[in-house]
From Swiss-Prot:
GO terms for biological process: viral capsid assembly. Keywords: Capsid protein, Host nucleus, Virion. It comes from the Viruses. One of its GO terms (cellular component) is viral capsid. Belongs to the herpesviridae TRX1 protein family. This is Triplex capsid protein 1. InterPro entries: Herpes_1. One of its GO terms (molecular function) is DNA binding. Structural component of the T=16 icosahedral capsid. The capsid is composed of pentamers and hexamers of major capsid protein/MCP, which are linked together by heterotrimers called triplexes. These triplexes are formed by a single molecule of triplex protein 1/TRX1 and two copies of triplex protein 2/TRX2. Additionally, TRX1 is required for efficient transport of TRX2 to the nucleus, which is the site of capsid assembly. The keyword Iron-sulfur does not apply.
Amino acid sequence: MKTNPLPATPSVWGGSTVELPPTTRDTAGQGLLRRVLRPPISRRDGPGLPRGSGPRRAASTLWLLGLDGTDAPPGALTPNDDTEQALDKILRGTMRGGAALIGSPRHHLTRQVILTDLCQPNADRAGTLLLALRHPADLPHLAHQRAPPGRQTERLGEAWGQLMEATALGSGRAESGCTRAGLVSFNFLVAACAASYDARDAADAVRAHVTANYRGTRVGARLDRFSECLRAMVHTHVFPHEVMRFFGGLVSWVTQDELASVTAVCAGPQEAAHTGHPGRPRSAVILPACAFVDLDAELGLGGPGAAFLYLVFTYRQRRDQELCCVYVIKSQLPPRGLEPALERLFGRLRITNTIHGTEDMTPPAPNRNPDFPLAGLAANPQTPRCSAGQVTNPQFADRLYRWQPDLRGRPTARTCTYAAFAELGMMPEDSPRCLHRTERFGAVSVPVVILEGVVWRPGEWRACA
């Protein structure tokens, strides 16, 4: 039996004539997709209708798919109601969505209006790391909850009070308590901890930059008092990583007097956002060299490949020698494998906190059940006992020996905490670019590290003890 092939264009399927648009007809791969969704031998109207009966009234295909430009209700089938037109619109939308996804990587921006006491974007540059600070009025209450017995909990409130006297809202401290929650520039935080870094010259350059380029006549006093706040937080076990979190990488800003509206990339590629500056339309992450650690190079680990970025706080809890440092660490180690590497890198701090972390704490009362008397209980046949299956039964469990030790002055996980880290993001390139150079901030030269291709992906804090 001889069969005639179906015409290409215009095509006649089931009595309807459709001509495909040239752009859609010529697109590679669409012919195969059309054959899968609509075989050429399929009938449009299904089984034949009885003679004398009209076509069924059904919802338009485009209307059901939400692709019909008109808002008309479902009606009779029309020449425009066919699978080919619906398929054309679906394919065009898919192609546009894929092109948009490839052309512009997804990133998320966040904006906040802040006081410029601890963050002045005019002095820093696009790509500077910003941290969000919890409301300072909450910190004295946290100190009363978390400080061990014997610690001076009022020290934290006094330190923040002195800091507020050197800020823009110092005159209203008695009425408002403390200023509202705001942002802390990573450069300002490093400048406040400058005395604690090993690279002292580079840290002093960051402090000189903040002192010279931040507006105000009491910037130096503000740095000293903020440093005292950090030490008081370590003293009262209100650790800085518990009240600070990643906010984003600075992109653009608008300032007026003591206020600033800052925009930052909080997730996604840092370089995907436009800065609005003609000279530097894109921003790479810029960090002080004294606060950057290439962990793989320090420990001789890894090779070429993508790397993670971590924000790390370190603490020393020895009495009257408390300190706090902040770093950005690059490593190929995932979060679950970073803690052993930090223990090796900051092992001296871990030992110091384990030995001296309980100093200046109220000691336990003498002979107050210091140890669990397991040997004596096991040797005494009259000691109440029960089987493992009877432990959940109050009739047997209530007769067991109750050990009530005095844990005051004893080492705990908080007294031994020497570091805390949180994932910031990653550098997905096989060979991440870390450029070490000296940048001019006004009249001050600061050694910096520029990280290219950073993708922000912030995570939760993890304490190391």
